């Protein structure tokens, strides 16, 4: 590892403020309040149940 790579850290305020991308990935932190509202409708119809079939015992487990 080069000394230059060690020097570049997202904890360094000057580097962080001058950066054009976020270390968590492109588009991180760009959700608006409208995107986060809980009263929005879901995209796909759902009954609220999630079911899975267990291979070991062959039973169906559902949870709400």
Swiss-Prot record:
Residues 1-45 form a propeptide. There is a cross-link at residues 52-57, 54-62 (Beta-methyllanthionine (Thr-Cys)). There is a cross-link at residues 59-64 (Beta-methyllanthionine sulfoxide (Thr-Cys)). One of its GO terms (biological process) is defense response to bacterium. Maturation of lantibiotics involves the enzymatic conversion of Thr, and Ser into dehydrated AA by the enzyme garM and the formation of thioether bonds with cysteine. The 59-64 beta-methyllanthionine thioether bond is oxidized to a sulfoxide by the monooxygenase GarO. This is followed by membrane translocation and cleavage of the modified precursor. The sulfoxide group of the 59-64 beta-methyllanthionine thioether bond is mildly important for activity, since the antibacterial activity of deoxyactagardine is marginally lower compared with oxidized actagardine. Keywords: Antibiotic, Antimicrobial, Bacteriocin, Lantibiotic, Oxidation, Thioether bond. There is a cross-link at residues 46-51 (Lanthionine (Ser-Cys)). GO terms for molecular function: signaling receptor binding. Belongs to the type B lantibiotic family. Has potent antibacterial activity against some Gram-positive bacteria. Has good antistreptococcal activity. Inhibits cell wall biosynthesis by binding to lipid II and blocking transglycosylation. This is Lantibiotic actagardine. It comes from Actinoplanes garbadinensis. The gene is garA.
């Amino acid at each position: 590892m080069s000394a230059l790579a060690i020097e570049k850290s997202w904890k360094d305020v000057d580097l962080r403020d001058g950066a054009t991308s976020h270390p968590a990935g492109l588009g991180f932190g760009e959700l608006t309040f409208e995107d986060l509202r809980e009263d929005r409708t879901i995209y796909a119809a759902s009954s609220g149940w999630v079911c899975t079939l267990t291979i070991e015992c062959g039973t169906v487990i559902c949870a709400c």
